[in-house]
């Protein structure tokens, strides 16, 4: 294995990245654009293959296999970016004082360390929930690909962004889909209920059974294949597959064991540095200014800023107003800014095929917006009006 390059002081010059998801690979690309020679090592528990994670919400309608999602193998990515890749190598711990990462394949020294450990799919607190399908990675899809392709009756637990995308995608392929959420409407963390009504209508028009204000009380494996699912109102149904899409939980175990400050995520400052010197965090695992930002655009901007910082030019992360896109083809949505809050006054324009909803503060300033259906072209003009 290639040894780490040492500085004159005997400290490794290597930038070591733990993880191989979008954040890790985007950081590698950003570093390479700025410096063709900087030693970089990426350690990952999987193969390190590059794929497009948002495609996971649409694999059924596209008939896409897990293998076909791979854009570039880990070894090809490493060769292309001229980095040292250590695949299939779980990390056991971090020693910040010695600047050492301990793994199943031995110890690796670092000059700067980046935690890009991502987040894991949350599961309901129920017996047997570990057997539910989650689709948070290519590996998870590969493990469940057979049951997903064969299932006719599918229950999706969670009507957030991913849950709605999955439900519509699977229904468009002729599956019998039930969408369950404790909230009274879909996308409840993003939208007022009234603005989700066209999306609800679009889901129903594709045959999705919407069960809001309800959770799952019990999941029982059936003889042979399938599940008997009991909702919190006592009703039961037979399902071939149950998918949990109730959010993400940042992977914090390594950071906690190393003594780094954590809350919901790994706490970072504006330079994305953790509470320990020479250790940074990026992506779904990081908590910046009190926020978790599990979206692609802030990760790209974070990777660009962090690359400059790691190469000697301190660059604080600043985020402009950013679009969140809900890829539900029968009724797509885009939103940005602040779209939840009792203090917001909404100005809405509806037609039979779309909506433009503007959220304004008491002084009339635009705070956020939602566009839906055939009104997508209104998104960017409104985005430019949001305060930066």
Swiss-Prot record:
Gene: norW
Required co-factors: FAD
Keyword Metal-binding: no
Keywords on record: Cytoplasm, FAD, Flavoprotein, NAD, Oxidoreductase
Native organism: Aeromonas salmonicida (strain A449)
Protein function: One of at least two accessory proteins for anaerobic nitric oxide (NO) reductase. Reduces the rubredoxin moiety of NO reductase.
Enzyme class: oxidoreductase
Cited NCBIfam families: PRK04965.1
InterPro entries linked: FAD-bd_OxRdtase (IPR050260), FAD/NAD-bd_sf (IPR036188), FAD/NAD-binding_dom (IPR023753), NO_rdtase_NorW (IPR023961), Rbx-bd (IPR041364)
Coiled-coil features, chain-numbered ranges: none
HAMAP family given in the database record: NorW
Reactions performed catalytically: 2 reduced [nitric oxide reductase rubredoxin domain] + NAD(+) + H(+) = 2 oxidized [nitric oxide reductase rubredoxin domain] + NADH
Subcellular location: Cytoplasm
Listed GO MF terms: oxidoreductase activity, acting on iron-sulfur proteins as donors, NAD or NADP as acceptor
Pathway it works in: Nitrogen metabolism; nitric oxide reduction
E.C. no: 1.18.1.-
Family the entry assigns: Belongs to the FAD-dependent oxidoreductase family.
Lineage: superkingdom: Bacteria
Any one annotated GO CC term: cytoplasm
Record-given protein name: Nitric oxide reductase FlRd-NAD(+) reductase
